[in-house]
Amino acid sequence: MNGSTAEPVLLPGERLEPLARGVSVIVGGAHTFNTDTILLAAYSLPRKGEICADFGTGSGTIPLVWCARADPAFVGAVELQEDACSMLERSASLNGFTGKIRVIREDIKNLSSSGILLKGTLDRIACNPPYKPAGTGIQSEDGSARLARHETACVFSDIAAAASTLLRWGGRFCFCMRPERLCETLEILHAAGLEPKRLRFVQQRQEKAPFLFLAEAVRGGKPGLRVEPVLLVEVGNGSWSEEMLAVYGEYKENHR
């Protein structure tokens, strides 16, 4: 059961953002979250008692949503940047989740060999990865933002390899990505021994092309990909869809 156990300690430039009833996250600077993060958190929601990890957790939105809405036994929140780790440690304390969330400051490329998380033990891994290959698009001058948006610290194949090593047989890897990289990501998953099982596109409105896809792959899974109905963010009058309100509603209610 969650509940605030301490007064929030906010550093200059930081603020609290509500995520769910009684649960908030400390964000600031480049360490914040967006619609993609919330959608992935809902899409990858753990089952009760699962042992999980979130790769590149940033300020820790996904682990906090998981603990607020589900009951995982453990969440390893993996993040390379020290300031983001500090934010999540304080958020976990604030919300009473220090017994479930462990902040792991480590490079994803070194995670499998570090021994911090045991190989073949995780039930579920999520990752909201950098969408853009290094050297493409507009490069942010902010180092944290650049790491989040561009594959400068790691590439998707590094993430898939780490997930495959750390997941148990039948464990699930959930992620989101831009549609133009769909073919590439499916090839990478197969090469890592992760079988794509679920795929869902996200559109802003019915007439718009998808801007995101959500996917789930299973370590050692049998072939067979289920393409799920499109998730619409908005309906015809510009208001949020019922499904979007269901996954994002508590946050939106707090920002009216």
Predicted segment positions?
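SAM-dependent Rossmann-like transferase core, predominantly class I methyltransferases
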Residues: E7-I51, T57-R69, E216
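Conserved Class I SAM-dependent methyltransferase catalytic core
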Residues: F33, A153-P210
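Mobile active-site "lid"/loop adjacent to the S-adenosyl-L-methionine
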Residues: P129-D158
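General small-molecule cofactor/ligand-binding pocket signal
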Residues: I26, R102-I104, K197-R200
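Conserved SAM/SAH cofactor-binding pocket of Class I
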Residues: Y43-I138
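Glycine-rich, phosphate-binding/catalytic loops in enzymes
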Residues: G120, E141-S144, A191-A192
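Residue-level signal for inorganic ion chemistry
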Residues: L40, N128, I159, A217
